[in-house]
């Protein structure tokens, strides 16, 4: 049986009100990723969200039950994926999910993914990049990018 791991890398206050620095946030992620790699997890799924902290905190039914905060890091998935591959030996990396609208559109995303796959092919590895896309779940995530859902 194969087990995967889901990472919601978020810079939001914990239950004690502590907000980690970006350096601490990434250090925690890399430590957890290293442990998952050593323990034999199959895929490290990385969540991504944009501009959702305040809105998510007001949501009476949050995406992640009992968690009123950011669902995933606002970052370039491909860059984080390559760094994750560089730091590990066995685990695959996947996006959960990349918002097409909030990340430059479908053509820009296709180019990023193609480049990332090409970079990965030059590593001594048979590992895979798993990619999931979405059109964006919430209007507040798309509107700042000039996209007004119908």
What function would you assign to each model-found segment?
Residues 2-20, 99-150:
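Flexible, glycine-rich active-site loops centered on histidine and acidic residues
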Residues 37-38, 82-90, 116-129:
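Acidic (Asp/Glu)-rich catalytic clusters
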Residues 94-98:
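Long, well-ordered hydrophobic secondary-structure segments characteristic of membrane-embedded
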Residues 1-87:
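N-terminal beta1-alpha1-beta2 module of alpha/beta enzyme domains
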């Amino acid at each position: 049986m194969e087990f995967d791991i889901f990472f919601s890398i978020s810079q939001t206050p914990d239950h004690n009100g502590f907000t980690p620095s970006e350096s601490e946030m990434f250090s925690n992620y890399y430590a957890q990723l290293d442990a998952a790699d050593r323990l034999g997890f199959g895929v490290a799924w990385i969540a991504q969200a944009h501009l959702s902290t305040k809105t998510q905190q007001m949501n009476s039914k949050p995406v992640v039950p009992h968690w009123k905060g950011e669902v995933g890091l606002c970052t370039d998935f491909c860059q984080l994926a390559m760094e994750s591959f560089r730091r590990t030996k066995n685990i695959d990396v996947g996006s959960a999910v990349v918002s097409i609208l909030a990340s430059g559109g479908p053509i820009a995303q296709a180019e990023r993914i193609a480049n990332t796959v090409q970079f990965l092919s030059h590593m001594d590895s048979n590992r895979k990049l798993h990619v999931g896309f979405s059109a964006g779940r919430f209007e507040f995530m798309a509107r700042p990018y000039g996209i007004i859902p119908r």
